[in-house]
Amino acid sequence: MIRQRTLKSIVKATGVGLHGGRKVQLVLRPAAPDTGVVFHRVDLDPPCDLPADPYSVCDTRMCSGLERNGAKVGTVEHLMSAVAGLGVDNLHVDVDAPELPILDGSAGPFVFLLQSAGIEEQKAPKRFLRVKKAVEYREDDKWVRLEPHDGFRLTFSIVFNHPAIDKTSTSVTVDFAEHSYVRDVARARTFGFMQDVDSMRAHGLALGGSLDNAIVMDEYRVLNSDGLRYVDEFVKHKVLDAIGDLYLCGHPLLAAYSAHKAGHALNNQILRVLLEDRSAWEIATFEQPGMTPAAVSHQFELAPAT
C-alpha cells in the first residue's frame, strides 16, 4: 500500500519575503492523516488557518497566494512543490507574515528542511486524484491541459524573446517515471528582469528580490556570477511552480500536464475546470500489492520516507 506521509519532527527556518521584503519565520509541523497542507497565520489575533485549496487562491501576480476571511499568505508554490515532490500529504505550516520566505528562489531549501525533519509514513492510504478525461484552459496564445496518464508527467514550453533565455532549452518534459524531483527540478530558481524591477517595486512587488534568491537578467545576459544550475533552469522553474500550484488540489495527480506560456493563474484555472467536471476525475488509492502503476512506485522510491 502507498501510504500518506507527514514529518517526523518540527523544523524551523527564517528568511525574507520576496515581495514584502520583511523577515519571515516559518515552522513546519507534522499533521494527522487526511489533514492536507494547512497554513497558519500565527501573527494574527486570533490566528487564521488557510488550508491549501484551489478555490482559496486569490492572487496570481508573480506567485500563488491564498486568502481566507481576509487573511492572506502568498508565495506558497515553492514549498507546495517541495511537499509534492517528497510525497508529503499532511503538514501544518506556521508563518508570521503575509508570505512565505523566498530563501534561494527555488524549492531546494524547502526540500532540505523537510528531509531534515524526517518523513514518515502514516496508517492511511495515499489518495491520488486521477484525471479520467482531458480538460483544457486557454487565454489568447497561452494554454494548459490535463490528460489521463498512469503516473505524473509535465511538459512545458516558454517564449520570452530574450537572448539569455533563448540560448537555453525553452521546452522540457519531466516524467516522474524516469526523473527525480530532488535531482532534476527542485533547484531551479525563479527569474526576473532588471528592466521590470522599478515597476514591480512601485506596485509593492519584489521588494525582497536579489541575486541571492533569483536569476536576474539585464537586456542581454544573466547577472548572477554563478550562472545557471541547469541548462534549462528557466523552463524547469516553470515546471517547479506548476507542481506546487497543482498540489493545491490537495492530492498528488495521476495525469499528464502540458502548458505553453502558462503561469500561476492558468494553473489555478485548469484545476478549477477539472474539479468542476465531476466526470473528469476520481480519487484513487493503491492498497493491494501489484496495483500500483510502475511510474508511481518509481516516483516515491526516489523520494523515500526516512
UniProtKB/Swiss-Prot annotation:
One of its GO terms (cellular component) is membrane. The keyword Hydrolase applies. It catalyses: a UDP-3-O-[(3R)-3-hydroxyacyl]-N-acetyl-alpha-D-glucosamine + H2O = a UDP-3-O-[(3R)-3-hydroxyacyl]-alpha-D-glucosamine + acetate. SUPFAM superfamilies: Ribosomal protein S5 domain 2-like (SSF54211). Gene3D superfamilies: lpxc deacetylase, domain 1, lpxc deacetylase, domain 2. Its EC number is 3.5.1.108. GO terms for molecular function: metal ion binding; UDP-3-O-acyl-N-acetylglucosamine deacetylase activity. One of its GO terms (biological process) is lipid A biosynthetic process. Keywords: Hydrolase, Lipid A biosynthesis, Lipid biosynthesis, Lipid metabolism, Metal-binding, Zinc. Its cofactor is Zn(2+). It comes from the Bacteria. The active site is at H264 (proton donor). Pathway: Glycolipid biosynthesis; lipid IV(A) biosynthesis; lipid IV(A) from (3R)-3-hydroxytetradecanoyl-[acyl-carrier-protein] and UDP-N-acetyl-alpha-D-glucosamine: step 2/6. Pfam families: LpxC. Zn(2+) binds at H78, H237, D241. It is an enzyme of class 3 (hydrolase). Catalyzes the hydrolysis of UDP-3-O-myristoyl-N-acetylglucosamine to form UDP-3-O-myristoylglucosamine and acetate, the committed step in lipid A biosynthesis. Belongs to the LpxC family. This is UDP-3-O-acyl-N-acetylglucosamine deacetylase. The gene is lpxC.
